[in-house]
Each structure stands twice: as C-alpha cells, then as structure tokens.
Amino acid sequence: MARTKQTARKSTGGKAPRKQLASKAARKSAPSTGGVKKPHRYKPGTVALREIRRFQKSTELLIRKLPFQRLVREIAQDFKTDLRFQSSAIGALQESVEAYLVSLFEDTNLAAIHAKRVTIQKKDIKLARRLRGERS
C-alpha cells in the first residue's frame, strides 16, 4: 500500500474544555467589591528576621531610659529608701542588663533549636540559666 501525504488540519489544542461547576461559575460572575486592594503582607517570619538583623547591627539601647530608671528605683526602694543615682550609674546598669538579656536570649534560642523548634519557650530559658549556673 502506497503512502499518502498528510494534509495540515487545525488543532483544537488537545482535550475539549470541561464545564465549570456551579460554584466556580458563580464566583467568577460575581462583581468585585469596588476594586479594594489588600495591603501587602510579608510571609510569616520575614519581618522577624529583618528586625533581628537590624537590631544585631545597631548599638543603641532598646529599653527606654525612663521606664528602666523607674524600675531600678522601685527595686532599690526594697533595700534602702531615699537612694540617689547618678545618671551614668543608671546608664551603666542599663547597658549591662541589655547585654545580659541579649546573651540569655541567644542561649535560649540555641536551646530551642536543639529541641528542633523555632519558637523559644519558658523551658528553654530555664535550661539556658541552669547551664550557665544561675539559680532558678
């Protein structure tokens, strides 16, 4: 049997289009609500990582000065009334407190990562303090 030449035919692109479900059709035909655009949102964790990088780069104090000063004075009241503080003493206390807290949170984060978690918990802080030899 001799071969015959095939002629070009218009293709329909494969499968025939399926009928839409009633719910999809209703959703598509419903008018949009005035074209109000949703505000942009970053994926969970993106902003947190950005803040971590920003605060690790910075050197300024993160706790506000006046609330910290009030707290120091309130704690000192338990030991002796009418104590006076130099502003440099409060500043030195605040520097050391923030350095302590940052290192504690670093150790706490390592404990959480060791437990295959990304969220720090109370038990991580307890473990970090116990490993440091602090009381609790």
Swiss-Prot record:
Modified residues (N6,N6-dimethyllysine): K5, K15, K28, K37, K80
UniProt superkingdom: Eukaryota
InterPro entries: Histone-fold, Histone_H2A/H2B/H3, Histone_H3/CENP-A
Modified residue annotations for N6-butyryllysine: K15, K19, K24, K28
Molecular function terms, GO-annotated: cupric reductase (NADH) activity; DNA binding; protein heterodimerization activity; structural constituent of chromatin
One protein family per Pfam: Histone
Modified residues (N6-propionyllysine): K24, K57
Region of interest (Disordered), residue spans: 1-43
One annotated Gene Ontology cellular component of this protein: nucleus
Positions of post-translational N6-crotonyllysine modification: K10
Modified residues (N6,N6,N6-trimethyllysine): K5, K28, K37, K80
PTM-bearing positions, type N6-acetyllysine: K10, K15, K19, K24, K28, K37, K38, K57, K65
UniProt cross-references to SMART domains, sorted A to Z: H3
Cellular compartments annotated: Nucleus; Chromosome
Post-translational events: Phosphorylated by IPL1 to form H3S10ph in a cell cycle-dependent manner during mitosis and meiosis. H3S10ph is also formed by SNF1, promotes subsequent H3K14ac formation by GCN5, and is required for transcriptional activation through TBP recruitment to the promoters. Dephosphorylation is performed by GLC7.
Residue(s) carrying N6-methyllysine: K5, K10, K19, K24, K28, K37, K38, K80
Keywords recorded for this protein, A-Z: Acetylation, Chromosome, DNA-binding, Methylation, Nucleosome core, Nucleus, Phosphoprotein
Residues that bear Phosphoserine: S11
One GO BP: global genome nucleotide-excision repair
Principal subcellular localisation of the protein: nucleus
Location of N6-malonyllysine modifications: K57
Protein task: Core component of nucleosome. Nucleosomes wrap and compact DNA into chromatin, limiting DNA accessibility to the cellular machineries which require DNA as a template. Histones thereby play a central role in transcription regulation, DNA repair, DNA replication and chromosomal stability. DNA accessibility is regulated via a complex set of post-translational modifications of histones, also called histone code, and nucleosome remodeling.
Note: Present with 213000 molecules/cell in log phase SD medium.
UniProt similarity note: Belongs to the histone H3 family.
UniProt subunit comment: The nucleosome is a histone octamer containing two molecules each of H2A, H2B, H3 and H4 assembled in one H3-H4 heterotetramer and two H2A-H2B heterodimers. The octamer wraps approximately 147 bp of DNA. Histone H3 is a component of the UAF (upstream activation factor) complex, which consists of UAF30, RRN5, RRN9, RRN10, and histones H3 and H4.
Name recorded for this polypeptide: Histone H3
Species of provenance: Saccharomyces cerevisiae (strain ATCC 204508 / S288c)
